[in-house]
Each structure stands twice: as C-alpha cells, then as structure tokens.
Amino acid sequence: ADASLPPVDALWLPGGYPELHGPALAANTAMREALRAFHADDKPILAECGGMLYLQDHLTELDGTTHAMMGLIPGDGIMRDRGGCQGMQTAPLPEGDIRGHAHHRTRTEDGPTPIAHGRRARHPAPGEPIVRDRRLTATYLHLFFGANPPAVARLFGATSI
C-alpha cells in the first residue's frame, strides 16, 4: 500500500471496493495523514463512491465488522446485500452541471447536509447527495468528465479555461 501522495495539485478518488480492503485501509496511517494534510492545505479533492466511503468516519461490512476510515467527511458507510441507487444523474455543482451515474451497495448514515442532490432524468425523487467541505467534493456519483470539461477543470481548481 502507498504510504504517501505524489506531488499533485488535486486528487481524484474514483472509487473501488474499500469493503474488500477495510483492515489495510484502516491500518495505513501514513496515507491517512497524507490525505488529511492535503485537505488541510485546501487542495481540491473529488471523492466518488468508494472514494467517498474511504473519507467517511467508518465502513461497516455485511458481517458487522467496522473499520475506521479517514474521518474527513462525517458519516458511516454501511454495506448492504442488495444494490442501491442506480442510473444516470446530473450533478448540479456550483462549477457547472456534470453528468454521471450511480451504482453502489452501501448506504450512508449520519452524513453532512448535502450542497445538492443529483437530478435523475426519469424519476422525480432526489438523486445522490453531493457534499462539500471547502474544496473536498464527495458523492456516490461517478462523474463523466467529458460531459462538461470546463466544469471539471474548475472543480479541480483551474482558474482559467
């Protein structure tokens, strides 16, 4: 497991399956401290799905085993044995609308108040929550960067496009 971040100006945590690596993620204190320092330096971070789960307080597996995660985003990710929200949504971000999709097998409890919810194309119910803490943006949505490249550039800190 990596113990440090490379020299970068922004981070994208695109997901994966943190539930398969809970003990290793919890034990990697060097990387956890590096991510905390990156966030404290107010650099842009986009965390999607599993990346968002990694940044929450805890992740609980189906058998009830709970692992400490980063604690940068309040809340707990809890595995469930069936799929959650699925389908295309648009993320209405301050930087601009960006299309994406959701597919996950967790739910989040005790999370922060979202800045927005994804908009579903064919369903009136609110989509996935989108949370923000300074320059950290987190959501279950997997964003399609090609949908709005200028908005993505602004999300990652570009000042001119």
Label for each model-derived stretch:
Residues 1, 34-35, 55, 126-128:
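Generic recognition of flexible, low-complexity loop/linker segments
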Residues 18-92:
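Cysteine-nucleophile active-site neighborhood
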Residues 77-161:
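Amide-donor transfer/coupling interface in amidating biosynthetic enzymes
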Residues 1-5, 26-29:
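A general structural motif
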Residues 12-14, 46, 138-140:
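Structural motif
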Residues 2, 8-13, 54:
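Helical hairpin unit composed of two closely spaced alpha helices linked by a short loop
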Residues 7-8, 41-43, 66-68, 97, ...:
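Short coil/turn connectors at secondary-structure junctions
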